[in-house]
Amino acid sequence: MGPVVPVEAFRSAGKISALGAKKGYVTFLAGNGDYVKGVVGLAKGLRKVKSAYPLVVAILPDVPEEHRELLRSQGCIVKEIEPIYPPANQIQFAMAYYVINYSKLRIWNFEEYSKMVYLDADIQVYENIDHLLDTPDGYFYAVMDCFCEKTWSHSRQFSIGYCQQCPNKVTWPAQMGSPPPLYFNAGMFVFEPSKTTYQTLLHTLRITPPTPFAEQDFLNMFFEPIYKPIPLVYNLVLAMLWRHPENVELEKVQVVHYCAAGSKPWRYTGQEANMDREDIKMLVKKWWDVYNDESLDFKAEDSIAGEETFSMPSFIASLPEPAVSYIPAPSAA
């Protein structure tokens, strides 16, 4: 169990942000590798769905200047951040590169924005999701993860075949105590930048032993008191297609997370497990169709204008009371 997070770290719940507040999307980029293609694809995807908000790219100092210029040429707001490292520990992360992901915590310091949607660089947006920026304040919104892949082999959930995506299939054994709290995938989430939250995150990190899923485990621990699940249409982790197909209506999915081994479109060969599936091939092609569409390249006239004039969808008017644990998705139609 992690440290107790003081309630002062969170804003008061239950209010709606002012319509004129500055909002945006944010992603994270490190190094000189090919993930920059993912960010370019994401920028073009947000333009394709006519998002009213900018894409901020939080970059580490090791991102080369040519990649920064490429991102600016695609209309991105590039903000350099300093890396954050967890306390020294002998833990083996599920993936070695996860250690650098703690640097994502810097985005809570982007106080010029009242609310943001974080998206990993291997995500693509296929429907307009701007309405997520009008959800009630005081909560952390994200999609529940799946525990069925081998990267979870270290966990109690995996050891007994339990997954929160189908909690009645294998029930949590009484002898193991209470079931674990709901756990989200940190590739996409809705959050509120705040100096107080930012400082508390950094302080809590210094006294929290690292765990295999790095910043994702940490964020789950930290935001457990205010976490609200949202439908998987906002972050389709590809393993859901073969682990829980009964939970997926692919035609309604609005955000696809290309996080399965071999699924990054810019590296795709179809050789890895499950990558020869027709639905995977279709989703990879769908990403490339956006990436290669020159009409989606940034033009000066595309500059984000007048966020104050963005109209709130009727979706917000029908939101349940903030005390509920689930925010429904609007139709993808």
Swiss-Prot record:
Molecular function GO terms recorded: inositol 3-alpha-galactosyltransferase activity; metal ion binding
Tissue: Expressed in source leaves, specifically in the mesophyll.
Keyword terms of this UniProt record: Carbohydrate metabolism, Cytoplasm, Galactose metabolism, Glycosyltransferase, Manganese, Metal-binding, Transferase
One Pfam family from the record: Glyco_transf_8
PANTHER family: GLYCOGENIN SUBFAMILY MEMBER
Enzyme Commission numbers on file: 2.4.1.123
Main location (coarse class): cytoplasm
Location of the protein in the cell: Cytoplasm
Record's note on what induces expression: By cold. Follows a circadian rhythm; accumulates mostly at midday during the light phase.
UniProt keyword Nucleotide-binding present: no
Described purpose of this protein according to its UniProt entry: Major galactinol synthase mainly involved in the biosynthesis of storage raffinose family oligosaccharides (RFOs) that function as osmoprotectants. May promote plant stress tolerance.
Active site, per annotation: K104
Protein name as catalogued: Galactinol synthase 1
InterPro entries the record matches: Glyco_trans_8, GNT1/Glycosyltrans_8, Nucleotide-diphossugar_trans
Enzyme class: transferase
Binding site for Mn(2+): D120, D122, H257
Highest taxon above the source species: Eukaryota
Annotated source species: Ajuga reptans
Membrane-spanning parts: none
Keyword Amino-acid biosynthesis: no
Similarity-based family: Belongs to the glycosyltransferase 8 family. Galactosyltransferase subfamily.
Cofactor(s) the protein requires to work: a divalent metal cation
